[in-house]
Amino acid sequence: MSAISVLSHDDFVAQISSKYTDVIGAKLGGKIISFSDEWFAEANNLIQPGLPIRQVGKFTPAGAWYDGWETRRHNPEPADWVIIKLGVASATIIGTEIDTAFFNGNHAPAISVEGTFVADDKDLDSAKWEEIIPKTECGPSQRHFFARDALTEAPYTHVRLKQYPDGGIARFRLYGKPTAVFPADLNTEIDLAHVSSGGIAVAFSDQHFGAVDNLLIPGRGKDMGDGWETKRSREPGHVDWVIVKLGAPGYVDRVIVDTANFMGNYPQSITVHAINSPDADPAHDDPNWKLVVDRTKTGPHKIHEYIRADAASGSPDADETQKVLTSANDEVFTHAKLTIIPDGGVKRFRVFGRRASA
């Protein structure tokens, strides 16, 4: 069994959440499959984005309203539980955040996390569960950060959070490395930056209004809240940027910058660079970055597509397609860097291409 460490918030960000993906989040497609009880507050709240909130004096027919999962008192079983299907095909796990915000006097005294790999939800009844995080104490109204000393050896499709014996938990984050399922044919185009391909944002200049990891998740989202947005800049020459480690080294054939829902706060223009680097997070000013998309104006609520000059045509879903892609046909890249000028919001960043090797 891997050793478990209790980390501070800053250490958890530095070691875990900035390097791995929350594989159960609702915005990624994580889904509650079943639970033992949710008398006071729904289990689905556990995997919602954003920090939990408190509305003092608000009641439901079951009792005081809580932004989290809360079970009834006096559980006759050792623990209450909830089973969650990952938002990716499967993943290995490195750590978790358990937030008991606003649960004080009714918080979960202890938790554990288990995982299993099944082909179908109907197989869960006979599934074999493996311990990921052992039974660990929790305190009232606080964020708890637990990390393994190594990724789990096995990938999991579902996880089970237990609370002993009952009570409330506001949020549950589970960080790990998605297990990408790549097509056998290396010439098949895939989104190398997508979270399901193993893409992850490893560095950024700012994420004041919206997190950079939103750039790589499925779909176009529902509002500005599920994109990447930086604060307003006040200095001449300012730019913001994000560096994405691709899920696999590959050739870049097509890039998409989607400004969906960003109407008065989209970037004036963008550039895209790429690099082949042995470093997990190469410096944003590394001289080896190569220009892939030169400075190009953007517009509000649009899918901007950038393709090679020799490409036959672009995607029918794009609002605007430009044949401006450079350095893309014969070079292998491991990372891509999106720069927005001078600041603003972008919903999604896609880097389509072909893997360099199996």
What does each model-found stretch correspond to?
Residues 1-77, 94, 101-117, 123-125, ...:
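Juxtadomain low-complexity/linker regions and immediately adjacent membrane-anchoring helices
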Residues 55-73, 81-85, 125-142, 219, ...:
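Acidic/polar, low-complexity linker and loop regions
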Residues 85-89, 130-168, 239-241, 246, ...:
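Beta-sandwich interaction modules
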Residues 247-249, 260-269, 279-289, 300:
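Beta-sheet repeat architectures centered on beta-propellers
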